[in-house]
Structure formats: structure tokens, C-alpha cells
Amino acid sequence: MRILVTNDDGIQSKGIIVLAELLSEEHEVFVVAPDKERSATGHSITIHVPLWMKKVFISERVVAYSTTGTPADCVKLAYNVIMDKRVDLIVSGVNRGPNMGMDILYSGTVSGAMEGAMMNIPSIAISSANYESPDFEGAARFLIDFLKEFDFSLLDPFTMLNINVPAGEIKGWRFTRQSRRRWNDYFEERVSPFGEKYYWMMGEVIEDDDRDDVDYKAVREGYVSITPIHPFLTNETCLKKLREVYD
């Protein structure tokens, strides 16, 4: 397959290098990734300013470029400029830390894959769910095995897979729902060396979803969480109720 690999941790991150090198053992791999950390940039794109791109070296088997853009920019550039619109699969990752619950709305990793889904290209976001001790190789090897088994024709149009891999021994995988996992944010007030006040965002994770088949519960129990998601955000249940009342 011709595989495009991107991420939001940057071209220099271990996660993308390990993933690209392992995938290139069996596939034609192109890497287009941000030239610096772009975590939590969501699905932003670059407009009104130039996008710069530079060829970089990862390995002999991998064609790689860094860009000044976001993960979504990287996918657009790769598809339209570098790969001549011939892409069989897009993989975004391996991310350092989980992308579960409401994280996916902020995640540049997920947005890189979602950009592919919006083009109706098979796309996967993959994260090592332990931020402190990420197992990039374990996540990458899981993905390689998964690709040999999974039938992408089972996915609806414009749908991607969001995969979170637990650290340590993997018991198997589960197809899961996006959870209601979210953050309670607060801001720590600090003072710069120049005496200027600034704020540092902090947060505590809230995991109180009462459903059993959600992403973080699978990961907590040692299973890889695989969640099919799409870019269409309409709340169909609420829409039906509103129409019944007001139409």
C-alpha cells in the first residue's frame, strides 16, 4: 500500500519515526508532519500565510517532509502535492498519550486522520495511551498486525478509526464508543522573570461514563480501544425531538 503518515507531535518525535520505519518494511511510506509540536491544534488549517515544506531524512525506505503547518495541512499537502492523490491509507501517530472521549475534539492526531476521512480515504489515528511511558513500538506493531486482518470495506463512507493502545501486555482489542471522558480545567497564575503575570492551564481528568463499552474502560482493562468516528456532528436524537415539538 501507499501509506501517508502524519502526527501532531512533530517530525522529530519517536512515535512517528518508529511507525514509519516499521510500516516501510512492507509498504511504500510517505511521511509529512509538522516541523514542531502541534498537539491540541484540533482541525485547524493554515490560511493567509505561506506553508513551507522541507525534505528530511528518516530512513532509506521512507520519503519524508516537514512542514510549517498543522496535521490537517500536512495531509492536504501530501495528498495534493507529494503523492499525486494516490493514497491507500492515512495513519496519524503514534501519539504520545491517549486520545479518548472529548480529547478527540482538540487532538491534532485525530484531526490528521479525520482530514483523510473527509477525503473518503481509509484513515487511522493511533495513540499510545500512557503519556509518561509510551510504548511506540508496541502500538506500531499492533497496527501492522491489525492492518493484515481488518476489512476497511466494513466502514461507512467518511469514517475513520481512532485507536488507543494500552501500555504493557495487550489482551486483545475491542470496538468501542467515544466516551464522555473530559477535563476539569483550571488556570495557575504565575509571574514571569520580568514581573509579568501569565496563566498556565492545568486540568483533572473526569471519567464517569456509566456505559461499559467506551474507550477508556477498554484501555484500563488492557484492551486496545478502536472507535469508528466521523466528521458529522448532528445530534440525531435531539434533532428528531426538536422537529416533533416545533415542526
Curated annotation (Swiss-Prot):
Nucleotidase that shows phosphatase activity on nucleoside 5'-monophosphates. This is 5'-nucleotidase SurE. Gene3D superfamilies: Survival protein SurE-like phosphatase/nucleotidase. It is found in: Cytoplasm. One of its GO terms (cellular component) is cytoplasm. A divalent metal cation binds at residues 8-9, 39, 95. The keyword Nucleotide-binding applies. One of its GO terms (molecular function) is exopolyphosphatase activity. Keywords: Cytoplasm, Hydrolase, Metal-binding, Nucleotide-binding.
